[in-house]
Swiss-Prot record:
Residues 91-152 form the S4 RNA-binding domain. One of the primary rRNA binding proteins, it binds directly to 16S rRNA where it nucleates assembly of the body of the 30S subunit. With S5 and S12 plays an important role in translational accuracy. Transmembrane segments: none annotated. It is found in: Plastid, Chloroplast. It comes from the Eukaryota. Keywords: Chloroplast, Plastid, Ribonucleoprotein, Ribosomal protein, RNA-binding, rRNA-binding. Pfam families: Ribosomal_S4 (PF00163), S4 (PF01479). It comes from Pinus koraiensis (Korean pine). Gene3D superfamilies: Ribosomal Protein S4 Delta 41, Chain A, domain 1 (1.10.1050.10), RNA-binding S4 domain (3.10.290.10). This is Small ribosomal subunit protein uS4c. PROSITE patterns: RIBOSOMAL_S4, S4. The lineage of its organism: Eukaryota, Viridiplantae, Streptophyta, Embryophyta, Tracheophyta. SMART domains: Ribosomal_S4 (SM01390), S4 (SM00363). InterPro entries: Ribosomal_uS4, Ribosomal_uS4_bac-type, Ribosomal_uS4_CS, Ribosomal_uS4_N, S4_RNA-bd, S4_RNA-bd_sf.
């Protein structure tokens, strides 16, 4: 299954807030009507697990195959499979760029990476899924137009409080990864155990 490229508000109305997918919000009236309709129906356990999985996939902008691969890696790692899964996704380079406020969404961050604008430890990295690690330093290509774009994004989209695993130096346009993210700083409201259960027969 390919990465979703359709209307983002359609996904938001169905799955609620996904900050990585879009910063837009649906109109309250239509949104509340959809919520009322959905709450009046009995939802199966499979549907609940499916929707949690879809939240994760659309928020991080993954294909079905990519997400399944991350689940399989998480199962082989030490610790809670769900927590490891979220940590792996949060430490992707495109998500780090998004969480630093350098891009308004994860698709926007992915575009910066794909175009070769991002440096990790002074080396150009153009792979959005690149796994970042503690002590990595994230910078941008030294280009006035790019700096102006990043500054605008930071002014508009940098969160009031960065997650504690990240530090950002605005004058240098430099991000620093302090540690692996703690689960309480994950921006997406998700029940990761339901995602693991969904894939229990496939991973």
């Amino acid at each position: 299954m390919s990465r979703y490229r359709g209307p983002r508000l359609k996904i938001i109305r169905r799955l609620k807030t996904l900050p990585g997918l879009t910063s837009k919000r649906p109109k309250n009236r239509k949104d509340s009507m959809n919520m009322n309709r959905s709450s009046s129906r009995k939802i199966s356990q499979y549907r609940i697990r499916l929707e949690e999985k879809q939240k994760l996939r659309f928020h991080y902008g993954l294909t079905e195959r990519q997400l399944l691969k991350y689940v399989r890696v998480s199962r082989r790692a030490k610790g809670s499979t769900g927590q490891v899964l979220l940590q792996l996704l949060e430490m992707r380079l495109d998500n780090i760029i998004f969480r630093l406020g350098m891009a308004p969404t994860i698709p926007g961050a992915r575009q910066l990476v794909n175009h070769g604008h991002i440096r990790v430890n002074d080396h150009m990295v153009d792979i959005p899924s690149y796994p970042c690690k503690p002590q990595d330093v994230i910078t941008i290509r030294d280009q006035p137009r790019l700096r102006a774009i990043i500054k605008k994004n930071i002014d508009l989209f940098q969160r009031d409080k960065l997650p504690n695993h990240l530090t950002f130096h605005p004058l240098q346009y430099k991000g620093f990864i302090n540690q692996i993210i703690d689960s309480k700083w994950i921006s997406l409201k998700i029940n990761e155990l339901l995602v693991v259960e969904y894939y229990s027969r496939q991973a």
